[in-house]
Every structure is written in structure tokens, then in C-alpha cells.
């Protein structure tokens, strides 16, 4: 009887752990879109260099393709408000890349939460309205099941990874397939890669869309009331 009780207790423990580990919704973690559709998404992380940000945005306007930017809250400057407004107005989108790019797996749950929410507050402060950062890319691509649950708890709808990460246009082109999410950063090497790569992708028949379009999300709903970080 004692043996049976121990087995039942172990089973209940395993069920509880599994339930906790998989608390986030199915499809919450994304590496690519539909492999049956010739659509891809260009993503740019960090935004350390505002000059390169402007160059990439100008390129997206010139070649008529959208970019999904995963921003660091600490790098959002008031002087860049105009370019962010233009990005949104011209079909681009903004996702969360945390406040200062830490290894989220090496900080406390509360600090990880703050990294997410402070960035939401900063983007709302810049734009003057609530722009939900429903996409998140964890720095270095590092996460745990617990962190995925945390992202879900604090308003993230999709954790977005990638399946192509090359700074050489030929290598990036060869690695790209239907549904690919391509990763770049705001530096001159990546900018010049995009200058060559985008026409190649377009000539190959790829439709370039935002990440949210690629994975079939509903249009973003903004609102007047800005988010204010409540944990100071």
C-alpha cells in the first residue's frame, strides 16, 4: 500500500510539473512560418546604431518590403521618434528584445519581468500611445520553459526565433526557404548584406512580410492609454 501511495504521489508530481512547463499556448514559440507558402520575414535586432536603423528603413522603403524590429528599450531615443513612426506607418512592426540584452536565463524571474515591461513602457512613452509589444525575441536566443511561461504571463503572444542567420548574401539566400525568418542587426555589414540580398529574394519570388503576417496573427490593436511600469 505504501508503495502504491508513493507511486501515486510521484505521478501527481509529474503531472503538476508537466502542466507548469507547458502553461504557455501551443504555437507560442516560433522558428519559421508556413513551409508551404513562399513568404518570409526580415527581422533586425538590438538597434544600437540609429544611423544604420535609418539606412535600413530607407532601404525598406526603396525596395518595398517591411522589417520587424526587435528593440532594446534602453536604446530607444527620443530623437528617433520620427523614424519609428515612419516604420509603423509604412507597414513595419516592433517587437520586444528586453531592456538591456541580458542572458535572461541567468537573472531572476523578477528582473526578467522588468526587462520586458520597461521596454513596453519606453516604446509607449516614445510613441505617445499604447503599442503592444506582442512579439518577443529573447537575447542570444536563450530561454527556458519557465521564461516562456513568464513571457506569456506578461502579454507576449509569440516568442520569435529564426532559422536563417548569415551576413553573407549568397549564404543567406541559399539558406532561405518558404516561411523563413531571417535575423540581422543594425550594423554596416548586415545593411550591405540586405542591399544585395533583398533583390535576390524578390526576384526568386518570395513575398516579404512582417513576422506577425508570416505566422497569421490578427492586425495589431493599439490604444490611447500608455502602459506604465508598476513595479518601481
Where are these regions (language model features)?
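Hydrophobic core
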Residues: 12-20
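Structured C-terminal subdomain patch of bacterial secreted/periplasmic proteins
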Residues: 225-232
Amino acid at each position: 500500500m505504501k508503495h502504491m501511495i508513493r507511486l501515486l504521489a510521484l505521478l501527481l508530481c509529474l503531472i503538476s510539473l508537466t502542466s507548469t512547463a507547458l502553461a504557455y499556448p501551443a504555437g507560442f514559440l516560433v522558428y519559421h512560418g508556413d513551409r508551404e507558402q513562399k513568404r518570409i520575414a526580415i527581422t533586425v535586432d538590438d538597434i544600437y546604431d540609429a544611423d544604420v536603423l535609418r539606412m535600413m528603413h530607407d532601404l525598406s522603403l526603396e525596395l518595398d518590403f517591411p522589417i520587424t524590429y526587435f528593440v532594446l528599450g534602453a536604446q530607444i531615443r527620443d530623437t528617433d521618434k520620427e523614424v519609428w513612426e515612419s516604420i509603423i506607418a509604412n507597414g513595419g512592426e516592433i517587437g520586444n528584445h528586453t531592456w538591456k540584452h541580458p542572458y535572461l536565463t541567468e537573472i531572476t524571474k523578477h528582473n526578467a519581468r522588468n526587462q520586458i515591461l520597461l521596454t513596453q513602457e519606453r516604446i509607449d512613452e516614445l510613441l505617445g500611445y499604447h503599442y503592444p509589444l506582442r512579439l518577443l525575441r529573447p537575447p542570444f536566443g536563450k530561454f527556458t520553459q519557465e521564461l516562456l511561461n513568464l513571457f506569456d504571463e506578461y502579454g507576449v503572444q509569440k516568442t520569435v526565433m529564426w532559422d536563417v542567420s548569415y551576413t553573407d548574401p549568397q549564404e543567406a539566400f541559399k539558406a532561405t526557404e518558404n516561411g523563413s525568418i531571417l535575423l540581422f542587426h543594425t550594423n554596416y555589414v548586415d545593411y550591405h548584406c540586405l542591399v544585395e540580398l533583398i533583390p535576390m529574394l524578390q526576384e526568386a519570388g518570395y513575398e516579404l512580410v512582417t513576422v506577425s503576417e508570416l505566422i497569421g496573427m490578427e492586425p495589431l490593436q493599439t490604444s490611447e492609454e500608455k502602459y506604465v511600469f508598476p513595479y518601481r
